[in-house]
Amino acid sequence: MAIPGRGDVPRDPEEVLNDAKDFLGQYFASIRRANTPAHEARWKIVQEEVATTGTYQLTTTELVFGAKLAWRNASRCIGRIQWSKLQVFDCRQVTTTSGMFEALCNHIKYSTNKGNIRSAITLFPQRTDGKHDYRIWNSQLISYAGYRQPDGTVLGDPMHCEFTDLCLKLGWKPPRTAWDILPLVLSANGKDPDYFEIPRELVMEIHMTHPTFEWFKELELRWYALPAVSSMRFDCGGIEFTANAFNGWYMSTEIGCRNFCDTNRLNVLEKIAQNMGLDTRTPVNLWKDKALVEVNVAVLHSFQQHNATIVDHHTASESFIKHLDNENRLRSGCPADWIWIVPPMSSSITPVFHQEMALYYLKPSYEYQEPAWKTHQWQKSKPITGKRPINRKFHFKQIARAVKFTSKLFGRALSKRIKATVLYATETGKSEQYAKELGVIFGHAFNAQVHCMADYDITSIEHEALLLVVTSTFGNGDPPENGVAFGEHLCEILYADQVGEDSTGNQMLTPKSFIKANSDIQRYTAGNPKKLNRLESLKGSTTDATSIDSFGPLSNVRFAVFALGSSAYPNFCNFGKYVDKLLVDLGGERIHDLATGDEMCGQDQAFRKWASSVFNVACETFCLDDDETLQEAKRALGTVALSEETVQFARAGCRPATLHAALQKSLNKQFVSCTVKANKDLGDASAERSTIFIDLEPKEEIKYNPGDHVGIIACNRKELVESLLSRIKDVDDYDEPLQLQLLKETHTSSGLVKSWEPHEKLPIMSVRELFTRFLDITTPPTTILLQYLATTCEDEEEKKQLNVLATDPGAYEDWRHFHFPTLPEVLDQFPSARPNASLLAALLSPLQPRFYSISSSPLAHAKRLHLTVAVVTYRTQDGEGPVHYGVCSNYLMERKPGDEVYLFIRSAPNFHLPQDLSVPLILIGPGTGIAPFRGFWHHRRALQNSCSRTTTGPVWLFFGCRTKTMDLYREEKEQALKEGVLSKVFLALSREKEVPKTYVQEVAENVGAEIHDLLINKGAHFYVCGDCKMAEDVHQKLKGIVKKHGNMTDEQVQNFMFMLKEENRYHEDIFGITLRTAEVHSASRESARRNRVASQP
């Protein structure tokens, strides 16, 4: 490519299109979407824009990609190994010089970062016709003035004499010292320039001292810590940005050799040598070399003393060689200008001196352009003939004097340009609730955006400034359904990065990757990986600035993760931990340790503590220290965001949706309506617990595989709803369709506008129906809800008690676990509380679907769906409290033939049958854990009947229950044994009279040798379905079987279990606690405590 010109003439549309086509090809290739419909659609849009306007607008992600790539292509930069770590401030919306000045002050503050320099670029509007350019007239944002003296000498920096003269003619009145910071001279939209003095507190200056020469400080040398180039043209995709400022950090020789010792700069070399006692009359004694070394020693020493980032020329050279190797491997070349790359000192003993380099030019790029004062078309009298009036300078200088940079004026301006992306994945809606709360908190100081992982464009992740992840874990370590794709995409990025960009083997990782991750993650704790922290990693460093240890696709992303889960499960918060680890492995910088929120204990308090802490760290990381803004955010944390004045029920202006449509919108699921065909109890009349069989007929075709789940939408019990309705106010007719509305505030050019907006999820529905079908009134209220209830109490003692529960985590958890109260029970406990129905509806969580394993086969039970459901009832308060009824199990038990039930299918790909019928199966499922296995044996029978010649492998079923009266599907199992569909059936009884107490894992241990043979020699698949405690006991027992009969060490056993999961031969379908007897509840709390302790770093 030809040497780039100065770019003084605007480009014609044809040239713009040629460059745009090339750039878009690079961009879409970088996100692995080259030649896709998205690429073609974007190219079409660009062509249309150019045809209409002669130019086009880059998207934000294209701009960020281009800015980083231009640094990567910069042939004269030795520090390009850091090219992906560039913070881009998109200021294309700025149209005034005062706006430009504000943005550049923000840039200086962010990049200086109290000495921990961060690379950044600020970009202003692009060139259009060449007559409305935006320009920064300074060659660097920070530089020292140079005053020509009558005797021909220069006071200050001789390099800037011409520009200093220009500033003086514009009206600048400096103190005229050797270290005056030049004002910023800015022009917007082709208009004449204005100048602005940079607040001195923004400029970090390093006063030079020497580690051994005390006299060095008497020279009063100093230099600014931030090298921010501001006079170059950014050329990207045919678009030219004539006004931009970008910075890295200093290499010591730039100051020590060039700025201090060049003869046309400060030229202090001879003075230094004389102070050293060297003879400066002859070059033979190498006095220049000796003095030059000591000046550079002083520069490095001084920066280190001030904890300011700098890199020495040896380290920089070595990092460039590494970068060169990387680029040759990844891009088959690296443009490099040898003359500029080789340091001005000790050249031949650096590796770059001996490195052959090829100089060629790539786009996007940063190019030189003529100084603005040489090309500007003045609209008023030229400054060389007289002073022009200063229109805005004095006004803005008044503002700068009136408020410090840490004020709202500057702090909030910076915050609007720093994006904080909050991602969530959820099954129950809790993570979504927390994510939105986090969005509100961060919205006080950042441009906060909240997305579900399933809706997030993964190609944007490399360009995020701040990423906050809030995610739950489904089952025993799996991602929520709307987080699966995100996790897989992260795996794909990591795989591509490890294999190499040009690898043709790159493909989407399968969901079984999560199974392996679930195993690997057990060996991971939040404290294991090195915590990358910009606040500490580069301070005073001469080597870390070019370290490549933390490089990766996400090396410019700062992140923090809050993981939700239940410590009743062994793989506590597994998916959140997995995402946290993946982000680190991809080069992301964790600004806060992973935090976990336990459903069993103090989840709300853990979230609020983490949210407050991560907000403070994020503000510190991005230099947002506006005290008022921080206080506003802290006030928002842990308080009721809504009030009785901002929520209301109103008559709707349109007809209510059908119940089916309303449920689909509320839960964002596609439901199928089913008719109940049969509902029968599976146990004998003497059985102490009820388990029912439900036969459903879908009203439309559904597709599923054995092992999948259904999500059932249940109703709250009528007596609970009636009790609640009797205690609420602000609604007269509970059966009138109403719309829940929230008062929204919008900032417009006309001021603050308030309007009532419909709730985003709750439909137009009667209040009775909302509390029956849409809102969760059985889960113990959150501390936020208790805080609101306290405000509605007329009795002061009740108000005091509720406030204690809302603010004391220990008291809340003890109360919650002992009473486990429904909302009506809470209102009974505090009878003077009278909440508003509207605010109560807004604060309550949605009533979530309950999941059940499918007990049928699509081959054996066409157009039918079977469920096996344990009916849950229990007493709270150690068995002495009121009877509680499981919401969904009792709802299903009460359904009669002909009743309608709404459900949806949730795929469980990790619990499907192997395709090969000859593969042996080991099935372990006590109680309702037998549910999916009934579908399995019916499915196997249907397959065997249709493929008579196929050899089928053995199927062993281990079932457990309390007594023989609870032996579910006993007759079906006996028939399957007779037909050879089941090979062996084992029964474990834990409460049968005159029979030794046994559990399924103990029965399995008794035939451990055979199980070992099936797994090792026959390739059997091992399935476990049941509660989390049983599943963990089975897992541990299987490890013991393998160790004993395989004569393995503990490490070999661990590796074997990892292998089973990696090969997708160990399958778990695990659910939480369904029985809340005192015995079970006490055991679950103790198990949860152990799992929490085990998961801590």
Curated annotation (Swiss-Prot):
Gene3D superfamilies attached to this UniProt entry: 3.40.50.360, NADPH-cytochrome p450 Reductase, Chain A, domain 3 (1.20.990.10), Nitric Oxide Synthase, Chain A, domain 1 (3.90.340.10), Nitric Oxide Synthase, Chain A, domain 3 (3.90.1230.10), Nitric Oxide Synthase,Heme Domain,Chain A domain 2 (3.90.440.10), Nucleotide-binding domain of ferredoxin-NADP reductase (FNR) module (3.40.50.80), Translation factors (2.40.30.10)
Q: What residues bind FAD, as annotated?
A: 704-715, 847-857
**Which Gene Ontology molecular function entries are recorded, alphabetically?**
calmodulin binding; flavin adenine dinucleotide binding; FMN binding; heme binding; metal ion binding; NADP binding; nitric-oxide synthase activity
Q: Does the keyword Metal-binding apply?
A: yes
Q: Which residues bind FMN?
A: 426-430, 561-592
- Residues annotated as binding NADP(+): 922-940, 1019-1034
Question: Flavodoxin-like domain: which residues?
Answer: 420-615
Organism, as annotated: Bombyx mori
Recorded hits in InterPro entries, A to Z, give: CysJ-like_FAD-binding, FAD-bd_FR_type, Flavdoxin-like, Flavodoxin/NO_synth, Flavoprot_Pyr_Nucl_cyt_Rdtase, Flavoprotein-like_sf, FNR_nucleotide-bd, NADPH_Cyt_P450_Rdtase_alpha
Q: Where is the FAD-binding FR-type domain?
A: 669-914
Question: What keywords is this UniProt entry annotated with?
Answer: Calmodulin-binding, FAD, Flavoprotein, FMN, Heme, Iron, Metal-binding, NADP, Oxidoreductase
Q: Which of this chain's residues are annotated to bind heme b? A: C77, Y368
Mind listing the GO biological process terms from this record?
A: nitric oxide biosynthetic process
| Name this polypeptide is given | Nitric oxide synthase-like protein
Q: Member of which family?
A: Belongs to the NOS family.
